[in-house]
Each structure stands twice: as structure tokens, then as C-alpha cells.
Amino acid sequence: MGKSCKVVVCGQASVGKTSILEQLLYGNHVVGSEMIETQEDIYVGSIETDRGVREQVRFYDTRGLRDGAELPKHCFSCTDGYVLVYSTDSRESFQRVELLKKEIDKSKDKKEVTIVVLGNKCDLQEQRRVDPDVAQHWAKSEKVKLWEVSVADRRSLLEPFIYLASKMTQPQSKSAFPLSRKNKGSGSLDG
């Protein structure tokens, strides 16, 4: 196991952020159970990457954002990844994700962070308000991966989180500027 990664889970209130984490990590979410508003919680999980390595991930479950409120500033420091959650039955929650993505882009400096977008409640087809093609087109233009998921189907949650853990813990590629032995101490890059 390598370093522990910090992932901030954010989105509008009542889109299912906590339910997603509870179902993913513990398999104990009951659809239709009473919603309790989250202030802020931390969940720790061990996720097997696509390389077969288990990585520890700390999920910062944030309070649902309401009425133009921004993500707290501490959510931007030392963060390796973000899970932006909207509900497929709420156009407003998708618009909030679009704003969050812009906020993250402004705040992340030059640091590389992995962003995954989840459209929750995809099983509620008759209440759908977010066109999946529009959402995928937006995700592609923003260079983020988007999955539609349902807390009722735990398997739908696995792929996005395996992708997230795998992407955040990719081995660093070799430097584009390898120094040969004879140059190491000279400070000169020419042979």
C-alpha cells in the first residue's frame, strides 16, 4: 500500500453523497431510509486499483451545498481527487457540479488532481431531469470521467472508484530530463 490519498466528495444537498460512500464502503445503505444532513465526515477505505494494489483512500464527505454556497477553502488543500455528485432527477444539482468543477480548476494551482463525476439515482428514470448525453458531452469537454450510478446497485459504484484510486496512484513516469552521471554535480545539462 502506498500513500493515503485525500478525496473530497461534494455536490448539492440531498444528491446522495453520504449514501454512495456508505454503500460503497460498508454495503449498508437502505434505499428510502431517512436522510440525515451531513456536516462533514471522513471515511477511510481500501480500494484495489486496476494494477491489483490496494490503496488507502480518505474520503472527505462534505456538507451539501445550498444557495450559492462555495466549497470550504480547506477542501482544496492537499487534495488528490474529487468526486462531484449530482442527482439525475435534478437539473440544478448538475449545474452545481459544473460550477464546482470551475471552482476546483481555479483553486488547484498547477497540481494534478483526478476528478470523477457521478450522476446518482439513475434508476429513477421517470423522474430524470438531466439528459445523459448532455452530461457526457460536458464531461468530455471538461476532460473528466462521468458515470451514472445508483445507490440501490452497489456494483454500479465500483468502476468509478477503482478508476479514481488507480488514476491517483499511478506510478510517476520517469523524468523528461534524465541526468547522466557525468553531469550530476555540474549543473549543466549539455554533454
Curated annotation (Swiss-Prot):
Physiological role: Atypical Ras-like protein that acts as a potent regulator of NF-kappa-B activity by preventing the degradation of NF-kappa-B inhibitor beta (NFKBIB) by most signals, explaining why NFKBIB is more resistant to degradation. May act by blocking phosphorylation of NFKBIB and nuclear localization of p65/RELA NF-kappa-B subunit. It is unclear whether it acts as a GTPase. Both GTP- and GDP-bound forms block phosphorylation of NFKBIB.
Motif (Effector region): 35-43
Binding sites annotated in the UniProt record for GTP: 11-18, 61-65, 120-123
Subunit structure: Interacts with both NF-kappa-B inhibitor alpha (NFKBIA) and beta (NFKBIB) in vitro. However, it probably only interacts with NFKBIB in vivo. Interacts with GFOD1.
GO molecular function: GTP binding; GTPase activating protein binding; GTPase activity
Cellular component GO terms, alphabetical: cytoplasm
Places the protein is found: Cytoplasm
Record PANTHER family: NF-KAPPA-B INHIBITOR-INTERACTING RAS-LIKE PROTEIN, NF-KAPPA-B INHIBITOR-INTERACTING RAS-LIKE PROTEIN 2
Gene3D superfamilies named among the record's database cross-references: P-loop containing nucleotide triphosphate hydrolases
Listed name of the protein: NF-kappa-B inhibitor-interacting Ras-like protein 2
Keywords associated with the record: Cytoplasm, GTP-binding, Nucleotide-binding
Residue numbers spanned by region Disordered: 169-191
Organism, as annotated: Mus musculus (Mouse)
One Pfam family here: Ras
Chief place where the protein resides: cytoplasm
InterPro entries attached to this UniProt entry: KBRS, P-loop_NTPase, Small_GTP-bd, Small_GTPase
One record GO biological process: lung alveolus development
